[in-house]
């Protein structure tokens, strides 16, 4: 029984104010209660201690979600993480909060797709010809961060979730 949604209401049982992850100490000092819970939850999820399809981070703007996510990622090699957003402007915003340590792309690029328009003038993603699944950016990283997931088409979101689950990737969605 996998849970589909994981919010900020996780009750954690940690000893002290820090956790160890990938041989690095991740301090919870300076975080408020909600941020501490989120960082602890993300770390537990990344370590495989939570049986979830993905880790959902939600909350009002200005509550420190970006700051807390960066704190949780400190225990990972930057090459293991890729961030993606629906549009180029959203990608740039994600890049601003993740910093230069991590690769950030559009969702289309993450999946090796290009943007086109259907007969109604709606933007759609289509698979690029000749793109092998193993060469896609989503396949080269262990942790996938999707920003503004509500802006992504349901079919594309389902494809990302399926790839992450089939290929044992960790998916963090905002």
Task: Place the predicted regions along the sequence by residue.
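Conserved ATP-binding/catalytic motifs of P-loop helicase motor domains
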Residues: 1-174
């Amino acid at each position: 029984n996998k849970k589909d949604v994981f919010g900020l209401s996780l009750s954690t049982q940690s000893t002290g104010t820090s956790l160890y992850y990938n041989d690095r100490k991740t301090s919870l000092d300076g975080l408020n209660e909600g941020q501490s819970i989120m960082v602890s939850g993300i770390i537990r999820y990344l370590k495989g201690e939570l049986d979830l399809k993905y880790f959902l981070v939600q909350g009002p703007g200005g509550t420190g979600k970006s700051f807390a996510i960066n704190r949780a990622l400190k225990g990972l090699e930057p090459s293991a993480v890729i961030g993606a957003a629906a549009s180029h402007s959203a990608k740039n915003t994600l890049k601003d909060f993740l910093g230069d340590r991590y690769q950030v792309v559009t969702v289309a690029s993450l999946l090796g797709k290009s943007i086109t328009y259907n007969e109604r003038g709606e933007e759609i993603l289509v698979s690029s010809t000749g793109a092998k699944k193993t060469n896609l950016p989503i396949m080269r990283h262990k942790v996938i961060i999707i920003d503004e997931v509500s802006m992504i088409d349901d079919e594309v979101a389902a494809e990302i979730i399926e790839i992450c689950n089939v290929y044992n990737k960790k998916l963090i969605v905002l």
